[in-house]
Amino acid sequence: MNKIYNNLNIENLIKTNWFDKFTLAQQKEIRLGLEADLDVSIYAKTEFVAWQMEQIRLGLKNNIDVLIYADNKYSWQQMKVIRKGLEKNFDINILLKESFSFEQLLIIEDGFEKNINILNVINNKLTREQIKAILNCYLLGLKVEIKDFI
């Protein structure tokens, strides 16, 4: 965001040409960030879709280091799982290096919501079913390794 807009209040900012270049959904995320007094300059960029903006905004709201995932190379689904992992203080480095499918990400996210991080025992070559089986083993208190499922 250009410095010229720094001293404008929200009502005046949304009347600028700068704000008009965003879609309505993107504008909503920017407005929500401004209303929460967040640094929207991190995500108020046209290259982010609204869902990516939302994940960055939620991370800022929860005091997460969003610069880890505020990159257009990550889909909004990847950003969501990375954010949730960071919120739990899990090691999410594999998520930054490997590209998991949407279905795989849903299982990883399910584990995060149950305070279980299986990232150290999976990779993106495993099927959805294999990753789900590993998560289920962890839920039962069983420790497993990838070799147990290949």
Map each language-model feature to its residues:
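General marker for long, soluble alpha-helical cores
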Residues: 1-150
